[in-house]
Amino acid sequence: MEELLDRYGIKPLVGVIPDNRDLSLTDTYEQDPEFWDKTARWKEKGWELALHGCYHKYTTKEGGINPVNQRSEFAGVPLDKQKEMIRYGVDVLKSHNIEPRVFFAPSHTFDENTLIALKEESNIRIISDTIANDVYFENGFYFIPQQSGRVRKLPFKMVTFCYHPNMMKDEDFEELEIFLKGRHSNFASVQDMK
């Protein structure tokens, strides 16, 4: 994925799990001892590194204010606990020289308490998790529409596409490259957001 994005000059938004405790990931994939070195390289390239939850563990069956799934690390969790998780997650990223400006939750689910926790415990004011036709500003946050699954031509000014490279097949990479070949000039980084 990194090589493909570099080839077309794409500076992606990458979700970083501060302290991955998701057994579906930790029991399936070997821990990468060079992970934090990779994040430093991505940051050096101008990639945007986002806070992607805290532990990536689902503790509720709620969808919150973006109910695209009925499981969450955040939605339905008390404010004090969410503040603790946001603070801890940001501290872990900062310890690796990452100052997150963007948040997106595991399974894209969060609630009003998540927004309060982000305001009180971080400088994050951009959320890349919403169903909308355009970027909008509400309650002190910019919300960027997010489309799961695959890239496709959409009538929106700005949208993020959600990919999990560890789950992609060869044909998924081929489809992405075909799309990027013809449309890479339409991609923008988070820094370009106006």
Predicted regions and their residues:
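C-terminal domain-boundary segment and adjacent tail
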Residues: 9-16, 126, 167-194
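A basic- and aromatic-enriched beta-loop-alpha substructure that forms the phosphate/nucleotide-
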Residues: 39-77
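Active-site beta-loop-alpha junctions enriched in small/polar residues
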Residues: 17-19, 54-56, 131-133, 147-149, ...
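A conserved mid-domain beta-alpha-beta active-site/ligand-binding segment of alpha/beta enzyme cores
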Residues: 137-175
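Acidic-and-aromatic substrate-binding clefts and catalytic sites of carbohydrate-active enzymes
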Residues: 19-35, 57, 61, 79, ...
